[in-house]
Amino acid sequence: VLGVGLTALIWGGSFAAMKLVVQGGLSVGALLSLRFTLGGLALGLLAWAFKAKPGSRALLDSLLLGLVLTVIFWLQTDGLRYTTTSKSAFITGLYVVFTPLVSLAVGDRLRPSHGIGALVAALGLFLLVNEPGKPFGGWNFGDTETLLCAVLCGVHISMTAHFSRRSDSWTLAT
């Protein structure tokens, strides 16, 4: 329970931290370059320490995953310039709705609970972002960027599930 609480605290706190950094004047590109460079170096050192030897298929898979992840982080971070942290966190969390929908699009079957979950999440999104009297109910550009981020999170999770069947996890992670 403590681990779950700590994870939620770190994940939730990261939205506020990213918003402060972006509002402080650091460009999204510079922030993400720094973040991905540090993360890549750390994982690269671990892969080297464990003597990971990726094949060409695994390298291509990891490159594709990395490109999608870069767009995800770009959309989410840039979206924070226009929307609130609470809206961003909730909208991003809608990836749990989009992941099964992406799976459906590539031929997997859905359970009825997925449809119910999608409806409940859509209602929650409406209640969170709707501001009567404002144009488009208060929906803004940052909300749109973050929604695209959530859709791509679903794509990324589905891609990871597919690629992990054929590629080494260390290679996919780095």
Language model regions located:
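Hydrophobic alpha-helical transmembrane segments
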Residues: 1-6, 33, 59-63, 90, ...
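Glycine-/small-residue-enriched transmembrane alpha-helix faces in small-molecule transporters
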Residues: 1-33, 67, 71, 75, ...
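Specific transmembrane alpha-helical segments of multi-pass solute transporters/efflux pumps
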Residues: 10, 14-15, 44-92, 99, ...
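Small-residue-rich packing faces within the transmembrane alpha-helices of Major Facilitator Superfamily
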Residues: 12-13, 37-41, 97-98, 122-123, ...
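Hydrophobic/aromatic residues within transmembrane alpha-helices
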Residues: 21, 31, 35, 79, ...
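C-terminal ends of transmembrane helices
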Residues: 42-54, 98-110, 157-166
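Hydrophobic transmembrane alpha-helices of multi-pass small-molecule transport proteins
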Residues: 43, 63, 69, 110-131, ...
